C-alpha cells in the first residue's frame, strides 16, 4: 500500500490540482540547450572569418574532400543534428541567397547575440523583453549603417573593382584577385543595362570548369563555351555559323519493347539497311537545306543520339556536330545564340536557327579541348567564364570565389551604396547603440547595451585571426569611433588600425544590413522557443 501511495504522489509531481503542467525549469533548460547548440555552429566557422581566416577541409561519406573558408559551403556540408543548430545553417543559406557574401559574418554575429541572450536570461530578464529590445536595436542599427554608407555609381569601375577585390581577399584564391575581380565586374556589366538595372540574373553568367592549366588561364568569353567535344573532327571551325539545336535523335527508329521483326532472308536484311540509310539521309538533307552548318544534339538516354551513319553524312555535308548537350544547358544556349530547340525534323526551318560569327574547337595546351561560339547576334545578354585549375579542389574553390564576387557586384546593382569593411561598421554600431541605450529606460536599455557589446565580435575575431591582440585592438577602435572617426577599421595587411576607406577595403551596404537583420531575426526565433516536441 505505501508503494502505491508513493507511485501516485510521484506521478502528481509537476502537476497542480487543475492538472496543468508545472515544470518551471524546463523552458530555461530548452533555451539553454538551443543556445548552446547554435553557438557551437557559430564557433566552428568563427576561425574562418576575414582575409587571414583559416580554411576548413571537409570530407563527405564518399571520401570526397572540399577545401574552403566560405561559411555557407562549410555549414551546408556539415552534419548538424540539433534543430536550433540547423537554424544557423539555414541563416547562412539565407544570407547567401540575399547577398551572396557575409555568410560567415552572419553566423558569427548570431552566435555572439545568443551569448548575450544567455547572460540576460541568467539575470532573470524575460525572453519577450530581450526579443523586443533586439528588434529596436536592429532598427536603429540599419539607420546607423545607412547614414555611414556612401552612394556609388555603376559607371565607377574602380569602386566596383575594390568591392570585388575585398570579397576575394578572404578566399583561397586571393592571390589571383587582380585577375578575377575585373573578370567578375566585366561579366556583370555585360549582362545588364547599368542605367535601368535593379538586379542581376546570375543564370546569365555561366561558369565552365575545365581541369588543367592554372587559375591564370581563366578567361571571360562573350558568347558560348561548351566542354563537349566536336563529334566530327574534320569540321572543327565554321565562320558565319548557322546553329541548330535538336532534341530528337539522328539514328534509326527503334521498335517498341514488345514488338519483334523477323528477317527470313538476306534481301529483306538489305532492304532494312537501305530504309535506315534513306531515313537518315533524308533527315540530314533537311538539316542542310535549312542552311545549318553547326548542329547541337541533346543528350538522349533511350538510344544513340547520333548514329555513325548520320555522322558520316553530316561530315560529308561539312556540318560541325556537338552531341551530348545537357538538358539544363539548353535555356542558356538558346538565350546566348538566339536559336530555338527543335523537337522534330519537320520543324527544322531557317528561322529556328541561331547565328554567330565563329564556331570553333579550341585546344587547351594538352589538357583537352573546348568549343567556343563567339560573335553571337542574339539580343539576350549572356557571358561565359572559363575556370581553369590544376585539380578539382582548386577549380571548385575558384568557382565559389567568383560566384561571391559576382554576388557582391549584384548587391551594388540592387542597392547602390558602399560601406567600409575591416570591422568599422560593427564598431560604429556598437558605439552608436550604446549611446542609444542611454536614451531608453529599464530593462530595454540593458538589453540594447548587451546587443551593442555583442557586435564587437566581428572586429575582435578579425584581429584574433590576423594575430593581433583582440582586446587592445577593439579598445583602440572604440576610442577612435567615439572621437568621430567612423572609417577607422582593422588593417589586416599592415597589422594595425587605419582609415579603411583609404585602404579601399569596402563592401556593399546590402551585405551588412542583410547580415544584421537576418542574424537578429534568427536569434529572436531561437529565443522564443520554450519547448521541443518530437512529432510522430
UniProtKB/Swiss-Prot annotation:
InterPro entries per UniProt: Chap_CCT_delta, Chaperone_TCP-1, Chaperonin_TCP-1_CS, Cpn60/GroEL/TCP-1, GroEL-like_apical_dom_sf, GROEL-like_equatorial_sf, TCP-1-like_intermed_sf, TCP-1_chaperonin
Biased composition (Polar residues): 1-15
Residues the record lists as binding ATP: 50, 102-103, 171
Disulfide cysteine pairs (residue numbers): none
Main location: cytoplasm
GO cellular component, one term: cytoplasm
Keywords on record: ATP-binding, Chaperone, Cytoplasm, Hydrolase, Magnesium, Metal-binding, Nucleotide-binding
Region described as Disordered: spans on this chain: 1-26
TM region(s), chain numbering: none
EC number: 3.6.1.-
Cited SUPFAM superfamilies: GroEL apical domain-like, GroEL equatorial domain-like, GroEL-intermediate domain like
Catalysed reactions, semicolon-separated: ATP + H2O = ADP + phosphate + H(+)
Subunit structure: Component of the chaperonin-containing T-complex (TRiC), a hexadecamer composed of two identical back-to-back stacked rings enclosing a protein folding chamber. Each ring is made up of eight different subunits: TCP1/CCT1, CCT2, CCT3, CCT4, CCT5, CCT6A/CCT6, CCT7, CCT8.
UniProt family annotation: Belongs to the TCP-1 chaperonin family.
Name of the molecule in the record: T-complex protein 1 subunit delta
Organism name: Takifugu rubripes (Japanese pufferfish)
